[in-house]
Amino acid sequence: MSADSTVKRRRLEPEERRAEILAAARKLFDAGNYASVSTSDIAKAAGVARPLINHYFGGKRELYLEVVRQMMVVPAPVTESLPKTTREHRLAISVDRWLDVVERNKRTWLTAIGPEAIGRDPDVERIMLEADEIAADHVLEAALMTDIVEGREELRAMIRSYGSMLRAASREWLIRGTLGREDLRAFLTDSILHLLNVTYPKVLAATRDGRTPPE
């Protein structure tokens, strides 16, 4: 009897089954790495027959890319149901929630942003670009700035750049241990607030004057 046939199966709706496979894959990739995890491992952990992984995702690589996407695209709950309070408070809460997500999925997240992420292929790069755009949307939402029109593209560009700094700073926390979580939370919160409250208005004023912002 094959390993696939001995798996206990529960009857689930397709979306529930897909989510269950994703959750199992995320845990396995977080505990190991892309090369060390097989589709058989994932099928066993998810309680499904191996062909179902191909049915829902196409194969191990496609499943891994979806896991990467889940890790890199800032989840909606990070900015959902924020209190109707100040920009500072809302952004501090969002940063704290985001750190929770990264801490829970440390290894998978680090692999996704690292050079070993299946060769840093174009699909991973595409996911990173998508993640940057969605993160910019979430920052604007948390900062109560979704209606900004003037200088919007420049503002989004600065927020995307902040995202790159955020990833580098998070590696200092998770890998080097040079920053504690509270240090990182304060650094990330203060940095985005300075960008929105000081840098963006300065760039906007310079653009209105038709000149380059001073050094």
Short names for language-model regions:
Residues 18, 39, 61, 65, ...:
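Short, structured helix-loop boundary elements
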Residues 20, 24, 28, 32-62, ...:
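Helix-turn-helix
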Residues 20-28, 74, 93, 97:
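Pre-recognition alpha-helix immediately N-terminal to the DNA-recognition helix
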Residues 64-71, 112, 127:
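Alpha-helical DNA-contacting segments of helix-turn-helix folds
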Residues 66, 80-107, 149, 185:
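Hydrophobic alpha-helical connector segments
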Residues 76, 122-146, 156-168, 183-186, ...:
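Amphipathic alpha-helical packing segments from all-alpha helical-bundle domains
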Residues 102-126, 137-140, 168-175, 204-205:
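Amphipathic alpha-helical segments used for helix-helix packing
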